Amino acid sequence: MGVRISQIADELGYTSQEVVAKAQEMGYKRIKTGSNSVSDEEASAIYDYIQTGVLPKKTEKKQTAKKSVKKDTVKKDTVKKTAVKKDDSKAAKKTKPIAKKSAPKTEKKVEKKVESKISKPDNEILEAKPEISKPEIKAEPKKEEIEQKQEAEPKIEVMPEKKSKIKSAFARGETLASESLKKRRGLVIVKKKKDLQTTETQKIEAPKTQKINLGLDAIFSNADANLKKKEKKKEKKQVQSKKVDTTKIDLTSDRELADIRIDDDEDMVVLPDLTLKPIQVEQKTKTKDQPNIYKVSQNKVYGNDGSIARGARKKHKKAVKNSDNEIIKSIEIPKEIRLYEFAEKIKKQPSEIISKLFALGLMTTKNDFLDEDAIEILGAEFDIDIKIVDENAKLNYVKVYDEQNLDDKNAVERVPVITIMGHVDHGKTSLLDYIRNSRIARGEAGGITQHVGAYMVEKNGRKITFIDTPGHEAFTSMRARGAEVTDIVIIVVAADDGVKPQTKEAINHAKAAKVPIIIAINKMDKPTANPDMVKSGLAELDIIPVEWGGKYEFVEISAKTGKGIEDLLEIVLLQADLLELKASLNVPAKATIIESSLQKGRGPVATIIVQNGTLRVGDTVVAGVAYGKVRVINDDKGKKLKDIKPGECGVIVGLSEVPEAGETLISVTSDKEAREYAKKIYEHNRQKELSKSTKVTIDELSAKIAEGEIKSLPVIVKADVVGSLEAVKSSLEKLRNDEVRVDIIHSGVGGITQNDVGLASASENCIILGFNIRPTGEVKELAKERGVNIKTYNVIYNLIDDVKAVLGGLMSPIISEIEIGQAEIRQVINVPKIGQIAGCMVTDGSIQRGAKIRVIREGVIKFEGNVSSLKRFKDDVKEVAKGFECGVGIEGYNDMQVGDFIESFKEKEEIASL
């Protein structure tokens, strides 16, 4: 390969152009850019020339004419080097203040150590570690450079041997990498044994004895000094045979201790033991018999010297049994309580409660939450009258809001909220498109609605809010949310298709929400339209039209031509007038989150419908675990609004995280209040989730064990909005049987991130499913590198079909048998060294070589195996048809009898499907 000019430039700290100029001076005219490469020999020659300024012997003759130019460049280089060194000195001052402070103190010692090492050439001498690993140009150093170097680094004398070693290393042709490694290593000085013992021991030794003063000064100021003096008494008795030469080492200096070589005992540098354990032990033993002065003296201002404290009396702990003996007859228990908390309340041991529940067939731990039934049963078991109190009412900010805003005196008429529901492809979105003069249906993937949408329409000077819900079976929870928020439900039924499963489900949702229902019979423009079929089908569900004596309005419409839509809107407004929908304007806002998502550049975004009050920009809100200040409000067309009044819809930005769809959003007075609500709800939900994972009944235990044997497909699900994520998750959880299931290890709203890829790579055979999102190029590259499969979809049933196919591959294949033929054994021949050969007559189909056979005797299967040989007379054949005789040898079976039947068959494997 060779070495690029740019690599040499990086190593030396020069630009590529400067190195190219130097190379051309040396005679390498082919080198013109930094991307050109040279051989290792040429690279070392260029490196030496830039460092020393001396041309190699080969090129020296050619370059005599360019000496003046070279001098100028060398001067420039030296100027640049001084600038680099100045920067180095500044960096050294900033990054190593500790080393700088300690340098002047240890200067003399270091010089002595270096001089002592000159006499011992065998020892290892290493270079000082520079701040930047850029090699210097070997030019004449100026005074300014020397001064800068002295300021930046501690003054350490470098011996002439070192310079000669460096030059010889370059002469030997060391590589650039090895040279830079040497320069990165720090200064290591191995201490030769020297008579410094007297100076060290003089410093360490202290006066022999001194009486301990028992005043405050002895306790606070001189305690450590006295203890050290006492310690030295004991140390005198011990004879130090080894480790006499102890040398202080500045541990704070920037040195690599791994580079210090300890070859023998002579050159060993002994580190002082800095631990305080022996001092602490001695202190305990010495001060054990002394009176406790500190306790008495700490509260006195004067006269603390001669006082002696009385020994404190031992406090006898109260027996715990006394509290257990208390008989509790009645108690209030919170609705959500853990087992150990319940045990504390009724003065029982947790183990006692666990055993009671185990006897009742419920396996629990002390951290599990107890439900109301379990609490009542335990109350009966322990003969305690238990009253269950809902302490979580404090977390119910909606209830607090409703109690504070009961005054309806200032209520005004509000905008009606209409939800359009029905079966998939019956024309719900097309109807809304005609009303709004828009083209939403064309924009939806697959022509089906997969999001909940809220839209404002004005009719006869009055506003109407419409909610469009998906009709696909996967979006049940979306339809349920739409029915809960709405005032009136329009159920769309196709005149040519009649009542379908989702039609029935929509009617049930509307009845559960106790809201008026209007039936819109769509697609009346089709020739196959049959409205009577629709009416009779709905009559079976107790939805009887007004003309048949019922109470439900039926309107025949066409979303394509617009027929009957005006009549439908008139009926909607009439129904709204009958309901007398009212709300207060001048109270804090209360709204319902219809849909939420995470948008790039905007953060968490929520589509809401205000039910009471007025939501304004700048209001502080809380919605479940999400909270924040409303920064932006947009309508369904993207236009910015200042506020949203009751019954109106809008999109808000500013929440801390993506809220759950269906959550109630409340406007609160302060950010602190919102944060506290969100934090408490989050902690409560988390604890309940953790409790769920540990609870299991004895009946469920066997199912859990069996689940361990089930093959699972781990998936990570990411979607554009919360509603779609719910739908995908619920659909995937339904895809299971006794053999396989889907294991959702992570799900979330937003794009596929690198963290998702990392999590998928950590799980075996995990795939990432994206709904209405696309991964970025970086994420795709990382997924390809780690072998993670990412699949994205726009239509939910395509996603479900693909996952079904993958699960089918995990299932054991379905093996089916194909009968080929049957033969009757007429004669059995024993052949030496081979075994039995059956002389057969083929009675049905054919006998084939390679096929499986089974031997049947009197209707009972005696053996299953393979055909080892098949002959007709003396010839080997592949197949013998019906009506012909043949000889059959069966592999591994020698118990054939005349009258047995040989049945030939093949096994066919088919991929199982859910």
UniProtKB/Swiss-Prot annotation:
Residue stretches of biased makeup (Basic and acidic residues): 70-91, 104-160
UniProt biased composition (Basic residues): 92-103
PROSITE patterns assigned: G_TR_2, IF2
Binding, GTP: 422-429, 468-472, 522-525
Region described as G5: spans on this chain: 558-560
Chain spans, region G1: 422-429
Location of the region described as G2 in the Swiss-Prot/TrEMBL record: 447-451
Gene Ontology molecular function terms on file: GTP binding; GTPase activity; translation initiation factor activity
Protein localization: Cytoplasm
Subcellular location, principal: cytoplasm
Coiled coil: none
Entry keywords, A to Z: Cytoplasm, GTP-binding, Initiation factor, Nucleotide-binding, Protein biosynthesis
Span list, region G3: 468-471
NCBIfam families, A to Z: IF-2 (TIGR00487), small_GTP (TIGR00231)
Protein role: One of the essential components for the initiation of protein synthesis. Protects formylmethionyl-tRNA from spontaneous hydrolysis and promotes its binding to the 30S ribosomal subunits. Also involved in the hydrolysis of GTP during the formation of the 70S ribosomal complex.
Name of the protein this chain belongs to: Translation initiation factor IF-2
